[in-house]
From Swiss-Prot:
Protein family according to the UniProt entry: Belongs to the bacterial ribosomal protein bS6 family.
Species name: Bacillus pumilus (strain SAFR-032)
HAMAP family noted in UniProt: Ribosomal_bS6
UniProt keywords, alphabetically: Ribonucleoprotein, Ribosomal protein, RNA-binding, rRNA-binding
UniProt function note: Binds together with bS18 to 16S ribosomal RNA.
Database matches in CDD domains: bS6 (cd00473)
GO cellular component terms, A-Z: cytoplasm; ribonucleoprotein complex; ribosome
SS bond partners: none
Entry coiled-coil feature ranges: none
InterPro entries given in the database record: Ribosomal_bS6, Ribosomal_bS6_CS, Ribosomal_bS6_sf, Ribosomal_S6_plastid/chlpt, Transl_elong_EF1B/ribsomal_bS6
GO molecular function, one term: small ribosomal subunit rRNA binding
Name assigned to this protein: Small ribosomal subunit protein bS6
Keyword Transferase in record: no
Pfam families given in the database record: Ribosomal_S6
Length: 95
């Protein structure tokens, strides 16, 4: 199993309940595919360096996971489809 850092930005127009639901849904995507979440960080609402989909701000969420590639690939696939996530990146951590 490898260690990954997943960072995603939730669009700023969602309310607090919907934001919590998005975070829980994507954490469940990782854990249901065999990933172990080793840490999460909520960076809160931050200004973006440039406009993404007409948004100037977004809610940043960072998740550290230990998993096989399949869980991260499933997260990546669903994050691309989701309208609530405006940008995401998955980085494999060096050992």
């Amino acid at each position: 199993m490898r260690k990954y850092e997943v960072m995603y930005i939730i669009r700023p127009t969602v309310d607090d309940e919907a934001k919590k639901a998005v975070i829980e849904r994507f954490n469940n995507v990782l854990t249901s595919n065999g990933a172990e979440i080793t840490g999460t960080k909520d960076w809160g609402k931050r200004r973006l360096a440039y406009e993404i989909n007409d948004f100037r701000e977004g809610f940043y969420q960072i998740v550290n996971v230990q998993s096989d590639a399949a869980a991260v690939q499933e997260f990546d696939r669903l994050a691309k489809i989701s309208d609530d996530i405006i940008r995401h990146i998955v980085v494999k951590e060096e050992v």
